[in-house]
Amino acid sequence: MVLAELGGRITRAIQQMSNVTIIDEKALNECLNEITRALLQSDVSFPLVKEMQSNIKKIVNLEDLAAGHNKRRIIEQAIFSELCKMLDPGKPAFAPKKAKASVVMFVGLQGAGKTTTCTKYAYYHQKKGYKPALVCADTFRAGAFDQLKQNATKAKIPFYGSYTESDPVKIAVEGVDTFKKENCDLIIVDTSGRHKQEASLFEEMRQVAEATKPDLVIFVMDSSIGQAAFDQAQAFKQSVAVGAVIITKMDGHAKGGGALSAVAATKSPVIFIGTGEHMDEFEVFDVKPFVSRLLGMGDWSGFVDKLQEVVPKDQQPELLEKLSQGNFTLRIMYDQFQNILNMGPLKEVFSMLPGISAEMMPKGHEKESQAKIKRYMTMMDSMTNDELDSSNPKVFNESRMMRIARGSGRQVREVMEMLEEYKRLAKIWSKMKGLKIPKNGDMSALSRNMNAQHMSKVLPPQMLKQIGGMGGLQSLMKQMGSGKDMMGMFGGGDK
């Protein structure tokens, strides 16, 4: 999860109010001052922070609140709402449609990670069932075509470019025409970048845009520039019809919050954020789930979406049926470990689970957790079918554990540790017994069927306490809206 430190500081500021006997003006000001410092240190502009602080004070009028109101919860809701408002440009971006050719043109300054982002964007849509293709119209930077070619080949995405042609407009037009004939429904044009905003860059962008008539122009921006993103985004918007922004390198800079809020202030929707060098370190940016994860509240619908990507559609009904029965076997644990490893970076996956802030997984711990999962799977590979399909850990006597340890090259104590993890997960799984399963076995509908009662059973006690108990859980679910919006958090709430 990006901006983990910022999210941790805001969350701690809210939690400190739990230690206060009476929440008065002084307690509220201390909380808001800490949040203000955290936002300013993340390079969010002072006017935006000041406006947010003022709005929260207007919403949370402590003198007007009747006795019996949960002031901490009302303050938390106001903070959530204002953070969403700060990051939301209030304008949706163009979304490509399958089986209909869409041309998307990428623009940006050199060094922002534009070419890599083009491939990530193509790869993301390829996983969603699109037929993407890449066109290299960057004739300015030496090695640009080689880089795009290498990335595209690795991701198994068709590409077009030239080592001899120097006219970017000609390459762009030929590439787009070629892929339209091949029935590609998402044609991505990578254009030249520059070291600074100069007239020749903007003129070339205008010419390529005029010739290819893109459905969407995406501006790629480096997050390290912080609130300076406002001027940069405005400059590009005035030169070409920028319809969306992708912010890169969000994993390595403290100024990401400033960049996000600055771009939102230009009314340009941020559609993705780059969180690392790898192909799957690329997240859809959706304001409510993002803020929810930032504050350690999770993003249940995002988790279900990722799970859907790795669980074949024909296997989803069977998995949901097992979930409703509450019968957890080692084979199910093995399959779910495999799914988790396929879902992308563990830090990102865990931040989608309510009550888990990204700060809870320190840097370097992700690899350790991944290695542990793989060790457990190696041990399970040494089990018999009967052992894997048993839901009774008592079948694992000393001789069986020694056999599994020898077969997997591990210690007996490690086998015992793996079985303890199994018992812990089995306990959580059993609490899902009786969950209403969608008739068509669609996992996305699972979110709508989960109410606060189910979620409170699944969450570990310390996480539930962090959210504010049962009342806090219900309140947070309501914050995300009702109906479709409810999926942005935990799924359907109590009616």
Curated annotation (Swiss-Prot):
Task: Please name the GO terms that the record assigns under molecular function.
Answer: 7S RNA binding; ATP hydrolysis activity; GTP binding; GTPase activity
Q: What is the UniProt domain comment for this protein?
A: The NG domain, also named G domain, is a special guanosine triphosphatase (GTPase) domain, which binds GTP and forms a guanosine 5'-triphosphate (GTP)-dependent complex with a homologous NG domain in the SRP receptor subunit SRPRA. The two NG domains undergo cooperative rearrangements upon their assembly, which culminate in the reciprocal activation of the GTPase activity of one another. SRP receptor compaction upon binding with cargo-loaded SRP and GTPase rearrangement drive SRP-mediated cotranslational protein translocation into the ER. The M domain binds the 7SL RNA in presence of SRP19 and binds the signal sequence of presecretory proteins.
The protein's name: Signal recognition particle subunit SRP54 3
User: Does the keyword section mention RNA-binding?
Assistant: yes
What PANTHER family does the database record attribute to this sequence?
SIGNAL RECOGNITION PARTICLE 54K PROTEIN SRP54, SIGNAL RECOGNITION PARTICLE SUBUNIT SRP54
Chemical reaction(s) catalysed: GTP + H2O = GDP + phosphate + H(+)
Location(s) in or outside the cell:
Cytoplasm; Endoplasmic reticulum
Q: Which GO terms describe its biological process?
A: SRP-dependent cotranslational protein targeting to membrane
Record region (M-domain): 296-495
Q: What top-tier enzyme class does this entry carry? A: hydrolase
- Note down the stretches annotated as region G-domain: 1-295
* Keywords noted in UniProt: Cytoplasm, Endoplasmic reticulum, GTP-binding, Hydrolase, Nucleotide-binding, Ribonucleoprotein, RNA-binding, Signal recognition particle
A cellular component annotation (GO) from this entry: signal recognition particle, endoplasmic reticulum targeting
Organism, as annotated: Arabidopsis thaliana (Mouse-ear cress)
